[in-house]
Swiss-Prot record:
Its EC number is 3.6.4.-. GO terms for molecular function: ATP binding; ATP hydrolysis activity; ATP-dependent activity, acting on RNA; helicase activity; RNA binding. It comes from Streptosporangium roseum (strain ATCC 12428 / DSM 43021 / JCM 3005 / KCTC 9067 / NCIMB 10171 / NRRL 2505 / NI 9100). Homohexamer. The homohexamer assembles into an open ring structure. ATP binds at G132, K133, G134, Q135, R136, G137, K144, A145, G146, K147, T148, M149, R175. Keywords: ATP-binding, Helicase, Hydrolase, Nucleotide-binding, RNA-binding, Transcription, Transcription regulation, Transcription termination. Residues 1-22 are annotated as: Disordered. Facilitates transcription termination by a mechanism that involves Rho binding to the nascent RNA, activation of Rho's RNA-dependent ATPase activity, and release of the mRNA from the DNA template. It comes from the Bacteria. This is Transcription termination factor Rho. SMART domains: AAA. InterPro entries: AAA+_ATPase (IPR003593), ATPase_F1/V1/A1_a/bsu_nucl-bd (IPR000194), NA-bd_OB-fold (IPR012340), P-loop_NTPase (IPR027417), Rho_factor_ATP-bd (IPR041703), Rho_RNA-bd (IPR011113), Term_rho (IPR004665).
Length: 383
């Protein structure tokens, strides 16, 4: 006789639920999005790579509609390989339908950046090379002509007269002590890669800075970027050029001109947005043919030029501005008709004098008058 036995299956023990990653494990990070080879990194400490940077996969960049230069606030978990959630982009929680900088219409600068302060330097610039929102300007400077002082005066004037503008100072290949001086003397964003850092850092810093400026401009902000210097940025790209391409005089690789040209060309006044003003220094009379060629390449791309004179600086005449060689294209858009007529009359009067005599006369008269308006009235009465 066969006895059938049935074995009752024991119910499988329920697998304990996986521990849920609670919000207690989330960390909030904030920084600028830098995209390299389709992979993004949130730079949490400035513009250069750091140990606490957060990796953002390309899929998440597309998912959230992020762009290089965005200031992102997000949550993440260690080991910082992806984001958990994006909370805001450039201070906004509604960023997906924003306009694209490349699709916006550039127009001539129409709104003037008033630079006049107690400083004679800013008053001279305001008279002879007026700057508008969206200007693309070159500050052409030989060594020891006072370009750093000019930049500091420009930064101080913009901060004081236009606190609504977002000021960015980009220093490429500068001395560390000058970076410190700039950070302590201005109220604005300072992004710096000192001369002892590799060329790759110089170019990465500049690229992220201009993308940051574009994101602000397309959002309706007025941005002013002071770059020191366009020449050193061009040198860095030239050193990183792969070689084998067309080489210009002075050992300048033709391919190395495109990235700094793209940086400088980003300056524009946007019809339906904000504006991006770029004032960049260009070094001349350095004894390097490469520097001269870099300047010649950018000479015709700007719409404003302020030229400094080594001869005037050697005589301790500051600001060492070459008045005849400095000026702004389409300045009549920025100036009212009477002011435009008086500045032309002033130019003709000073143009008949030697450069040293003209600058001394101008600066003396400016110090005697409380404002440029009062000075121009004096010009009207005496010429």
């Amino acid at each position: 006789m066969t006895i059938e036995t049935t074995t009752k299956k024991r119910p499988r023990a329920a697998r304990p639920p996986r521990p849920r990653e609670s919000d207690a494990y989330l960390e909030t990070v904030a920084g600028l999005l830098d995209v390299r080879d389709k992979t993004g990194y949130i730079r949490t400490h400035g513009y250069l790579p750091g140990v606490d940077d957060v990796r953002v996969p390309h899929a998440q960049i597309r998912q959230y509609g992020l762009r290089p230069g965005d200031h992102v606030v997000a949550t993440t978990r260690k080991p910082y390989e992806r984001l958990a959630e994006v909370e805001s982009v450039n201070g906004s929680t509604d960023w997906r339908n924003r306009p694209d900088f490349a699709d916006m219409t550039p127009i001539h600068p129409r709104e003037r950046l008033r630079l006049e302060t107690e400083s004679v330097t800013s008053r001279v610039i305001d008279l002879f090379a007026p700057i508008g929102k969206g200007q693309r300007g070159l500050i052409v400077a030989p060594p020891k002509a006072g370009k750093t002082m000019v930049l500091q005066d420009l930064a101080a004037a913009i901060t004081r007269n236009h606190p609504d503008c977002h000021l960015m100072v980009v220093l490429v290949g500068e001395r560390p002590e000058e970076v410190t001086e700039m950070r302590e003397s201005i109220h604005g964003e300072v992004a710096a890669s000192t001369f002892d850092r590799p060329d790759r850092d110089h170019t990465a810093l500049a690229e992220l800075a201009v993308e940051r400026a574009k994101r602000l401009a397309e959002s309706g902000h007025d941005v002013v970027v002071l770059l020191d210097s366009l020449t050193r940025l061009g040198r860095a790209y030239n050193n990183l050029a792969p070689g084998g391409g067309r080489t210009l005089a002075g050992g300048l690789d033709a391919a190395a001109l495109l990235p700094p040209r793209r940086f400088f060309g980003a300056a524009r006044n946007l019809r339906d947005g904000g504006s991006l003003t770029i004032l960049a220094t260009a070094l001349v009379e350095t004894g390097s043919r490469m520097d001269d060629n870099l300047f010649e390449e950018f000479k015709g791309t700007g719409n404003m030029e302020l030229r400094l004179s080594r001869a005037l600086a050697d005589k301790r005449l500051y600001p060492a501005v070459d008045l005849d060689a400095s000026g702004t294209r389409r300045e009549e858009i920025l100036l009212d008709p009477q002011e435009h007529q008086l500045t032309w009359r002033l130019r003709r009067t000073l143009g008949g004098l030697e450069k040293q005599q003209a600058l001394e006369l101008l600066t003396d008269r400016l110090r005697e008058t409380p404002s440029n308006a009062a000075f121009l009235q004096q010009v009207r009465q005496t010429t």
